[in-house]
Amino acid sequence: KDAGEGIFTGLFSLVQVFVTMNPDETVYFANPGPDGKFNMDYYFHLADFNNEPINDWKDIASTLLSIPMAHQLIGFYTVADNADGVLKVMRSYQYYAANAISDVVSKNKWDVGNQRGGYIWHTTGSGKTMTSFKSAQLIANSKDADKVVFLTDRIELGTQSLKEYRS
């Protein structure tokens, strides 16, 4: 209703991630952009590391809305999708996975033994391309690796990823 009335222009156009709560449920989603087309497929429930939903407002305030997590979510765990012209935000399990992958790379002692790299193997499921892309981006930006290769198993997926995540 509010989007149709143009409420997401002006000040609200600067908000990157919205969090909405009622007594029973909390969802977060990226700003849908100037056209205000909200897609419920991109409304996510916050979950803990074990993917158990978090809905209590006190837990939401101490996790999702806390600093540094709110800053990390907006700064590191969103992707500007050039193909659609929208901002995408990661689901909780994607956030935890990308963060854990980046942590393993940063904490590993690469100069000990015969380690020269590694790989991440994803199985079929929702969000693996964004998770692997963000993991690669976090590792590359942290300078914890000399080179990061983003390899896909299909030409179409590589092309799609390049178009979506080029920014």
Provide a role label for each language-model segment.
Residues K1-K147, E156-S167:
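ATP-dependent helicase/translocase motor core
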Residues T152:
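Conserved residues at beta->alpha junctions
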